[in-house]
């Protein structure tokens, strides 16, 4: 892929044109400037803040979500290490490890949920937006949603592998098995885990075992919550490879929207014009009636 | 030599160079180009939340940086100058798909009062990426008033397309062309001139064997675009038309008669990538496997799914799953629609007759077969195709029957205007205007061979035909392509390269390539070690488009 940068040549051309005096004039020193106050005293002379220079407020959400996702990624790495340690057979007490795992899991799940909440808030904020800002907001949300989805899907995959190991199920999942299987099974596994804990409690089993199983159930609950979140986000996400993922299709769509909006506008305009005319006619009729009445009164006298 | 990776690395570079919130500014032509390479979600990942057209009314959004991907045309220049006099965005990064003339730069600089332009670059991506070895310039008609005369716009566009194709692949080729085609000669001269003129751009490391740019004229093989196709990609294009990766077809099985639109993109759709060259029979088997794959996944993992309602619920509950099932149902409905059309148009019989017409010795029974089909219940287009193929085959053997056939077409209910396609076709691509023979030579040896074939039993009667391009490429790869038919443009290059076996070959078919040819090129790329071929066409033809083009010619040629 060859390419050629023409910026240098272009700038040479641009400098050779004299119109750049305009810019110099602006920055040139103006003696009046010395005596100008920072805030205009004269109220009539309002300073104009051009709104189109400012990015919409919701853009900052991206930074927040970025840092949350970064945080979760770090936590997931920590968790990975803990998992690796934990599944190793040993006789020492694992309570501390388990607590740490639980803490991290809850933290990560919460972070994901916070992300989702942020998205929802932003969505509510941008509902009132119009025109290109609305479109931009929609695309913006869709991008963030798909990023959160990917991250959380990875986390869930790890969690369910761990869960399977804990429950002594066949943990040797072949790598060819797609993410798909994971999703289907991780929810199912989590549900059965929770049921089992409930069952154990009913049967009044050994307290130690119940405590262990409860910890496991916590993880399972997290998975279910995240699966729920994944579903909620799906509304926003663009399906890859589908027609809505085509750039030309999206442009066509906006053009169709713009056209229909224009039509509405014309309709409204003509409607307004008509009402004006109608009012005028009514006014004339009333006038005529009034004049007739006056005439009648005068004639009667 | 991979168009997909070349185009994607261009976009990767664009996205790297401009950070922060961006708006993408396109025009109609580049919208098609961009859509053929990347997707909306690719854009979103790069913080491009808005895509707009240069010619449209737009709001001012000066908190955004503008990435413009445009073709260097006079219209673009005018619109861009207006834009720069009153900039709508914070800064402009301009990427042009081709070489920018200096005067163009000067006029732009003149309008840039606010110094809004931050960078200008040439990224040579002036073609549509169809497959990773197939490109299209998207020009439907190329001829002005005689079959040897270029339409100015089309000529310029084709020339630009070839230049950008060469630059994006980093090739400085020697040029060979169809000796009997003035269109190819003119194009070859112009391309060669640009290569010399822009020697700075074409300054690539010299490979051991020079790459070859082979310019071919459609008129030397009018057969391929007229045949019924039997491989997936070609079939879809023949029956519904693939428009830059988008296919719309009316779904007769569903309740509403509205047409469905789908996307077929080999880079995004692994099933399509795998099956696009499979013939219809194999495709059916693969589709069945694909469906049962979906079935086993659902039953194995979630055993509670029993009814269709369960299935539906299940799909709604698991979005990742839905992606796969969406793809499965897309292909299933497409293939079922294909088989509907195959039945409706009696394509199995039509295909058999066609293949025996173009692959076997001419026989008198051919006429009866055609005659029977012309009065059967098939569409106008299919009738025209059959008649055209017969006319090309029997043009010299039996001219009386060829003209009788035209009367029969009219009697069979074909629009007389459309029947005029046949004389035009013979005038443009008839025997005396072609070189080489698209039909197998008729001599004792070939007759013996076809007899042998009959004995052994042909593997598949529907796909016996090999496009003429195949034999040209085979000759070229083995260094046997004759200079009498495909001369070098510059005689000095001939001395060095005539006997070499080329490695990198770029074939451009003036007048349009077909998916059947693309299939063979892909096959070559997969089976011939050391040989890399890219195919490009002024457009990608199916029979409808080809007949349309001939119709267009018939109204223009004096």
From Swiss-Prot, chain A:
One of its GO terms (molecular function) is SNAP receptor activity. t-SNARE that functions in transport from the endosome to the late Golgi and on the endocytic pathway. Keywords: Coiled coil, Endosome, Golgi apparatus, Membrane, Protein transport, Transmembrane, Transmembrane helix, Transport. It is found in: Golgi apparatus, trans-Golgi network membrane; Endosome membrane. Residues 92-120 form a coiled coil. Belongs to the syntaxin family. This is t-SNARE affecting a late Golgi compartment protein 2. The keyword Protein transport applies. The gene is tlg2. SMART domains: t_SNARE (SM00397). Residues 301 are vesicular. GO terms for biological process: intracellular protein transport; vesicle docking; vesicle fusion. Residues 206-268 form the t-SNARE coiled-coil homology domain. It comes from Schizosaccharomyces pombe (strain 972 / ATCC 24843) (Fission yeast). Residues 1-279 are cytoplasmic.
Swiss-Prot record, chain B:
One of its GO terms (biological process) is Golgi vesicle fusion to target membrane. SUPFAM superfamilies: Sec1/munc18-like (SM) proteins. Pfam families: Sec1 (PF00995). Signal peptide: none annotated. It comes from the Eukaryota. Disruption phenotype: displays an accumulation of abnormal vesicular structures and leads to valproic acid sensitivity. One of its GO terms (molecular function) is SNARE binding. One of its GO terms (cellular component) is cytosol. Vacuolar protein sorting-associated protein involved in Golgi-to-vacuole protein transport. Belongs to the STXBP/unc-18/SEC1 family. This is Vacuolar protein sorting-associated protein 45.
């Amino acid at each position: 892929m060859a390419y050629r940068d023409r910026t240098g040549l272009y700038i040479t051309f641009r400098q050779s044109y004299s119109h750049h005096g305009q810019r110099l004039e602006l920055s040139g020193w103006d003696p009046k400037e010395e005596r100008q106050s920072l805030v205009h005293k004269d109220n009539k002379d309002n300073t104009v803040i051009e709104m189109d220079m400012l990015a919409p407020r919701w853009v900052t959400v991206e930074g927040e979500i970025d840092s949350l996702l970064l945080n979760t990624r770090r936590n997931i790495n920590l968790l990975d290490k803990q998992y690796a340690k934990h599944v190793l057979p040993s006789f020492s007490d694992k309570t501390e490890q388990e607590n740490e795992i639980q803490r991290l899991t809850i933290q990560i799940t919460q972070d994901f949920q916070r992300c989702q909440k942020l998205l929802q808030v932003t969505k509510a904020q941008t509902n009132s937006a119009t025109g290109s800002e609305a479109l931009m907001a929609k695309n913006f949300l869709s991008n963030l949603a798909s990023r959160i989805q990917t991250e959380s899907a990875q986390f869930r995959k790890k969690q369910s592998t761990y869960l399977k190991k804990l429950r002594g199920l066949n943990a040797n999942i072949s790598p060819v098995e797609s993410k798909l299987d994971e999703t289907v099974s991780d929810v199912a596994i989590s549900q059965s885990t929770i049921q089992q804990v409930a069952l154990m409690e009913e049967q009044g089993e050994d307290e130690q075992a119940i405590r262990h199983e409860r910890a496991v159930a916590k993880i399972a609950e997290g998975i279910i919550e995240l699966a729920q979140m994944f579903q909620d986000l799906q509304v926003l996400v663009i399906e890859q490879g589908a027609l809505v993922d085509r750039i030309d299709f999206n442009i066509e769509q906006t053009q169709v929207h713009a056209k229909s909006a224009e039509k509405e506008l014309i309709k409204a305009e003509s409607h307004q014009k008509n009402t004006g005319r109608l009012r005028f006619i009514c006014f004339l009729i009333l006038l005529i009636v009034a004049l007739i009445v006056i005439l009648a009164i005068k004639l009667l006298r | 030599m991979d168009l997909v990776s070349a185009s994607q690395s261009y976009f990767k570079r664009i996205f790297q160079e401009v950070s922060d919130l961006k708006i993408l500014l396109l025009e109609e032509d580049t919208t098609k180009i961009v859509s053929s390479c990347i997707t909306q979600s690719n854009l979103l990942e790069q913080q491009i939340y808005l895509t707009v057209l240069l010619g449209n009314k737009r709001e001012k959004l000066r908190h955004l940086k503008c990435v413009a991907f445009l073709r260097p045309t006079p219209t673009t220049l005018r619109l861009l100058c207006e834009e720069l006099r009153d900039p709508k965005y914070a800064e402009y990064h301009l990427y042009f798909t081709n070489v920018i003339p200096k005067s163009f730069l000067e006029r732009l600089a003149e309008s840039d009062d606010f110094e809004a332009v931050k960078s200008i670059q040439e990224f040579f991506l002036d073609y549509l990426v169809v497959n990773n070895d197939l490109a299209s310039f998207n020009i439907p008609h190329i001829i002005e008033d005689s079959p040897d005369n270029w339409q100015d716009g089309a000529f310029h566009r084709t020339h630009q397309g070839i230049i950008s194709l060469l630059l994006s692949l980093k090739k400085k080729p020697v040029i060979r062309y169809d000796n009997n085609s003035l269109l190819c000669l003119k194009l070859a001269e112009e391309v060669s001139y640009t290569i010399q003129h822009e020697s700075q751009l074409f300054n690539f490391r010299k490979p051991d064997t020079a790459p070859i740019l082979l310019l071919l004229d459609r008129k030397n093989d009018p057969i391929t675009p007229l045949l019924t196709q039997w491989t997936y990609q070609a079939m879809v294009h023949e029956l519904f038309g693939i428009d830059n990766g988008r296919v719309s077809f009316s779904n007769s099985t569903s309740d509403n008669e509205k047409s469905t639109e789908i996307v077929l993109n080999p880079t995004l759709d692994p099933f399509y990538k795998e099956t696009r060259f499979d013939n219809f029979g194999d495709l059916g088997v693969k589709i069945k496997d694909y469906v049962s794959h979906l079935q086993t996944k659902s039953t194995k993992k979630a055993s509670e799914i029993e009814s269709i309602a369960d299935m539906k619920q299940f799909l709604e509950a698991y979005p990742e799953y839905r992606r796969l099932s969406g793809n499965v149902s897309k292909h299933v409905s497409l293939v079922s629609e294909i088989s509907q059309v195959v039945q409706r148009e009696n394509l199995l019989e039509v295909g058999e007759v066609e293949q025996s017409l173009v692959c076997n010795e001419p026989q008198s029974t051919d006429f009866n077969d055609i005659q029977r089909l012309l009065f059967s219940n098939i569409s106008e287009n299919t009738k025209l195709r059959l008649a055209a193929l017969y006319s090309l085959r029997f043009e010299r053997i039996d001219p009386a029957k060829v003209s009788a056939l035209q009367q029969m077409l009219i009697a069979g209910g074909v629009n007389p205007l459309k029947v005029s396609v046949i004389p035009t076709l013979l005038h443009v691509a008839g025997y005396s205007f072609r070189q080489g023979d698209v039909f197998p030579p008729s001599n004792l040896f070939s007759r013996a061979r076809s007899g042998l074939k009959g004995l052994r039993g042909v593997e598949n009667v529907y796909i016996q035909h090999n496009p003429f391009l195949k034999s040209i490429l085979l000759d070229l790869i083995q260094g046997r392509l004759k200079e009498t038919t495909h001369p070098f443009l510059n005689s000095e290059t001939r001395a060095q390269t005539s006997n070499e076996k080329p490695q990198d070959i770029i074939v451009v078919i003036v007048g349009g390539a077909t998916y059947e040819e693309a299939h063979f090129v892909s096959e070559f790329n997969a089976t011939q070690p050391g040989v890399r071929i890219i195919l490009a066409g002024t457009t990608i033809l199916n029979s409808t488009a080809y007949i349309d083009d001939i119709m267009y010619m018939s109204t223009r040629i004096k």
